[in-house]
Amino acid sequence: MIIARSIAGIFPPATMGLTRWGLVALFLAIILFPHVRQHVAGIRTEWRSLALLGGLGMGLCGAPIYLAGTVTTATNIGLIYAVCPLIILTFSAYVFSISIKLGQLAGLIAGLCGVLVIIIKGDVSVITAMQFNGGDLLVVMGTLAFAVYSVGLKQVKTTLPPLLRLGVMAFFGAVWHLPFVAYEIFIQHNIVTLTPQIFGVAFILVFVASLGAYLSFGVVVSELGATRAGTILFLSPVYNAVLAVTLLGEVLAQYHFVGLALILPGLWLANR
């Protein structure tokens, strides 16, 4: 979300998505190449499901979100994404008949309220003054796609190691961006200019937002399930607040503590 807003108008959305997942796929291909041969049969068997998961988790959660960052606010993006754990719970319950405890639901609602308090900075008028546009629909699409991707990570069985599975999905995620990159280059004539900022953004996207975040999330999903793993998303505004204090010298406000007082018990309830 922060990256999407910070590079709006500098890094074309589809090009950024292709760069992100293309570099992830290339990096993993290099370090995993000696081990790929023994998993060729598994890749051939699972490539359709991996292509779908890559399209959902890396494709629809890539360029559309970056494009949305050029036309909507970080607050709007944050508010819409905050609902993702509840979507994961609903999808798990109604599509895969996964039983949901009342305590889990209560925890998710409490966590959602805590996230909202932090995002709107404790000011309800922020919500009433919000204006929605087409960019918000892109965020909704990306949020739904990530929710389905999260559930699919657990429900779609695999024989591949986590890193190799991520690498194959990243490859398909990059492929999904190709038609839109062609549109940016040949129709819009929107070509990225290489600058130190672009290289910095690419590094963060590849090693932090992709390899680190997606691999960790995938492992948690495999161990705890999508519903419990989805509650991790509630900690995003907490991480942002801590980083803002330590790196930018910002000061914690009362709404941070109110939000945290709702998020932490919510996480406890949701993961009982």
Model-found features: residue ranges?
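Membrane-interface helix termini and inter-helical loops of multi-pass transporters
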Residues: 2-13, 70, 119-132, 183-197, ...
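Hydrophobic alpha-helical transmembrane segments of multi-pass integral membrane proteins
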Residues: 14-31, 52, 103-117, 134-141, ...
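Specific transmembrane alpha-helical segments of multi-pass solute transporters/efflux pumps
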Residues: 1-3, 29-81, 117, 206-224
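A helix-boundary/kink motif common to multi-pass secondary transporters
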Residues: 12-13, 73, 99-100, 161-162, ...
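Helix-helix packing/entry segments at the starts of transmembrane helices
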Residues: 17-19, 58, 62, 77-83, ...
